[in-house]
Amino acid sequence: MLYVKNLHKSYQSGNKSYSVLKGINLSVADQEFVAVMGPSGSGKSTLLNCISCYIPFEQGTITLGNKELKGLDETALAKVRNEKLGFVFQDFMLLDGLTIRENILVPKIIQGKVDQEAEKLADKLLSLFG
């Protein structure tokens, strides 16, 4: 389970501070798909970058399972990003020469962890789209 509690992020421009995320709260169950939607400049990418700890945030907590992500060293964060978090961005990004199923499995292929469980999950995801 992913929990985001009271997340705040702002950016500085000159003498001004711009609050982009103000008290964001959300929870996402294991294997749940969530769409983050909004107009350009609304903070969608900032939220995802905070969740993955690519950028710092001023206030709040992000917990995955029983681990708070803020404060993990880069090695531990890389492991979390590779094994526990996944993002699909709005740009169409399939790899030419691979089937859709193989594209779904790309992260597992890179990790060298294509197993029966990963293949079943890929098939399940494909069945959602017919």
Regions found by a protein language model. Name each.
Residues 60-71:
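Conserved ABC transporter NBD signature motif
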Residues 69-86:
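ABC ATPase NBD coupling module
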Residues 37-39:
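The feature captures the beta-strand-to-loop junction immediately N-terminal to the Walker
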Residues 52:
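Helix-to-loop junction immediately C-terminal to a conserved catalytic motif
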Residues 1, 10-23, 73:
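A short, flexible loop at the N-terminus of ABC-type nucleotide-binding domains that lies
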Residues 4-7, 19-29, 60:
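Conserved beta-strand
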Residues 67-68, 105, 116-130:
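Conserved ABC ATPase "signature" region
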Residues 97-107:
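Short coil-to-helix segment of the ABC ATPase nucleotide-binding domain corresponding to the Q-loop/switch region
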